[in-house]
Design a protein with these regions (language model features):
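Sec-dependent signal peptide recognition
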Residues: 2-8
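C-terminal motif of bacterial Sec signal peptides marking the signal peptidase cleavage site
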Residues: 14-17
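Ser/Thr-rich, low-complexity intrinsically disordered terminal regions
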Residues: 19-127
């Protein structure tokens, strides 16, 4: 009885500490209306900075975003045009990414949604 109880408690503890993986969330060609005097590149760079992402322009039309927080690391590619952008998973560390199932720790999706909202906010600003 004690052994069974111990096994059940251990299993419950492990299950409580593990979050299930979620499908990787990508933003595909999101169209935005830019505020006066704002470029898409400016909106992406400012939106990333607002959410503590390190953003770097790779070439015209492509920005790479990198986030490192509490031992977790993610990198996204952000291709963009004059009035749209995408956020695409590039790589991660310590996020339990499963390439075959294209699944990842759910925090990744939350970070991408927050980045998306920040970019949209910056795009709508009037400078």
């Amino acid at each position: 009885m004690k052994k069974t109880l111990g096994i059940l408690l251990t299993a419950a503890f492990l299950a409580a500490g593990c979050r299930s993986l979620a499908p990787v969330y990508n933003i595909e060609n999101k169209t935005v209306v830019l505020g006066s005097g704002v470029t898409m590149e400016q909106a992406i760079l400012a939106g990333g900075a607002a959410k503590r992402w390190t953003m770097s322009a790779v070439r015209p039309g492509l920005i790479k975003g990198h986030l490192y927080t509490r031992g977790h690391e993610v990198t996204v590619n952000i291709p963009y045009t004059q009035n749209s952008y995408s956020i695409e998973y590039a790589s991660s560390d310590n996020m339990r990414y499963n390439a075959k199932k294209h699944k990842i720790h759910p925090k990744y999706n939350q970070w991408v949604r927050n980045l998306d909202l920040a970019i949209s906010r910056e795009a709508a600003r009037v400078h």
